[in-house]
Amino acid sequence: MNDRHAEKIRRAYNVAYWGNDYFYINDLGHICVRPNPEVSQSSIDLAELLKEKEGKNPQPLPALFFFPQILQHRLHAINKAFKSARDSFGYQGDYCLVYPIKVNQHRRVIESLLKSGESLGLEAGSKAEMVAVLAYAGGTRSLIVCNGYKDREYIRLALMGEKLGYKVYLVIEKMSEIKMVLEEAKRLNVVPRLGVRARLASEGSGKWQASGGEKSKFGLSATQVLQLVEILKSADCLSGLQLLHFHLGSQLSNIHDIATGVRESARFYVELHKLGVKISCFDVGGGLGVDYEGTRSQSDCSVNYGLKEYANNVIWGIGEICNENHLPHPTVISESGRALTAHHTVLISNVIGVERNEFSPPQAPEKHSPRALESLWYTWQEMQKPDHRHSLRECLHDSQRDLQDVHTQYTHGILDLKQRAWAEQLYLQICHHIQKELDPSDRAHRTMIDNLQERMADKLYVNFSLFQSLPDAWGINQLFPILPLEGLNQRPERRAVLLDITCDSDGIIEHYVDGDGVANTLPIPPYDAENPPILGFFMVGAYQEILGNMHNLFGDTAVVEVSLDEQEKISVKIDNPGNTVSDMLKYVKLDPKALLAYFAQKIKKTDLNAQLQMAFLEEFEASLYGYTYLEHD
């Protein structure tokens, strides 16, 4: 296969863009992972990794493959981008990346980040998260940001952290919070370190735009900011207000929105200084997006900028306002959780069932068949003629109308089941023929191509729960890159839609990455229906594990940690074997031991022989302590 042909095939999956150097397709057509692309080009072939485990200790699927070195490299890359921006623009303030643990609170994630040796603060958005952050914060003077709704217990935990020597910023997001903070600080005899979240007029666009702007759930209006300043003055605590925070929304796709928001928030910085508030930290919140679809555009699941441009806009925007007003450069904080974690995990699962169209030469209808059947057959015959006068669009419309007539006549008892089946199969033959004749480069054909691809797509039933593993794909139509682990050096001749194994019609992935951006079907290479491909779901490291739910009692998948050691040998260890049926039953207060006892009682009341009773009981018990997903016998 020549290089041009290989590159054309690779473009069908856009890996070069969404992969961000962490993922690529090798010459064998396998998807590979580079855990630390800046240091080494050594990679891990996911297909070969699975095959190797199959020979030694087979890994049950689905499983989440966790790459701690990618996580650590993301931390390094973000810090590096901001250092470069500060150097370029002569910015005098520091920078601190803060990890909002709500993005993924799992221990393996927090510990991997803290072990990296890079500068990192932590953010809590709830009482439970505050407990975790206090326990995990690094040495004294570690930076902690406290967001979200706060009760007195949450506030006391934060103030305890301040007493322990951490730099803990209690961000005031509701006016009702300040009274509690001042009262609890007095009880603990500690000077609180405060922040204020300003509610901006600026907002981002996309799926999360409601989390920023004037309609935001959190933040103080301009009037409330002034009221807060007066309250702190009266309490002689104005010096404690040290941090200004804003948030435009998650996954900001347009760099212009970011620049606009930074400039508006910088005006708050200036005005607060005029009021005597010596703000020293400027928290730009989240919003640093990742390119899930690889189009480098302003669409909801993409971004039209990179790390460097984002850092440049933030640092230059704040620095410029400070210089204009002769104010000190504050420490810049960003809460870039999605950009930090999205790439570091890959969900891998097997296809457990395939439904696809197979075509054989059609047979003519019986003589004197109803008109709708004869009309369908006429369309098919006309299309076989090299000089047929009907356009492809006309043939498609004619066959669609005839099929509709067939369904109507079947409903009224005019046609029987065999006639309906014959008509539906011939209609698919017509669609298949038209699909092969259409030209993807012809814009007039584009809509027909998309519609036919969706109509003719294979259905792949995948061993996973959409609601557990990709909840954002279900809830907000979030896009995730998906592709087979191998066969990617072959032309993707087929299209597929992926369905999960829950008993829910919503358990279907509706949008996929392809070379043209976003499609309703997944391009896949030829495959044996008896041996369908293993699939990888990429960039699922942010939010998905935490948001996943227990629909149909499908539990957490197994988690496998994969890294390259100093000799660049692959190290694999099981971080979590995944939930068993017993685990999930306990979540809903069903006692597995009691269920086993109930089942045993039912068996004893039957007339089954002792051997069969024992076999049934053993099977039931094995199911109780087995994986919640489908397993190979």
From Swiss-Prot:
Q: Which UniProt keywords apply?
A: Decarboxylase, Lyase, Magnesium, Metal-binding, Polyamine biosynthesis, Putrescine biosynthesis, Pyridoxal phosphate, Spermidine biosynthesis
Q: Which InterPro entries match?
A: Ala_racemase/Decarboxylase_C (IPR009006), Arg_decarb_HB (IPR040634), Arg_decarbox_C (IPR041128), Arg_decrbxlase (IPR002985), De-COase2_CS (IPR022657), De-COase2_N (IPR022644), De-COase2_pyr-phos_BS (IPR022653), Orn/DAP/Arg_de-COase (IPR000183)
* Any one Gene Ontology BP term: putrescine biosynthetic process from arginine
What is the top-level taxon of the source organism?
A: Bacteria
Q: Is Isomerase included in the keywords of this UniProt record?
A: no
Q: What is its EC number?
A: 4.1.1.19
EC category: lyase
Q: Is Magnesium among this UniProt entry's keywords?
A: yes
Please list the coiled coil stretches: none
| PTM-bearing positions, type N6-(pyridoxal phosphate)lysine | K102
Q: Which cofactor does it need?
A: Mg(2+); pyridoxal 5'-phosphate
What is the catalytic activity of this protein? L-arginine + H(+) = agmatine + CO2
- Which Pfam families would you find in this protein's record? Arg_decarb_HB (PF17810), Arg_decarbox_C (PF17944), Orn_Arg_deC_N (PF02784)
Q: Which residues bind substrate?
A: F282, D283, V284, G285, G286, G287, L288, G289, V290, D291, Y292
- Which GO MF terms does the UniProt record name? arginine decarboxylase activity; metal ion binding
Q: Where are the transmembrane segments?
A: none
PANTHER family per the UniProt record, alphabetical: ARGININE DECARBOXYLASE, BIOSYNTHETIC ARGININE DECARBOXYLASE
Which HAMAP family does this UniProt record tie to the protein? Answer: SpeA (MF_01417)
Q: What does this protein do?
A: Catalyzes the biosynthesis of agmatine from arginine.
Tell me the protein family, please. Belongs to the Orn/Lys/Arg decarboxylase class-II family. SpeA subfamily.
**This protein's name:** Biosynthetic arginine decarboxylase
Organism annotation: Hamiltonella defensa subsp. Acyrthosiphon pisum (strain 5AT)
Gene behind the chain: speA
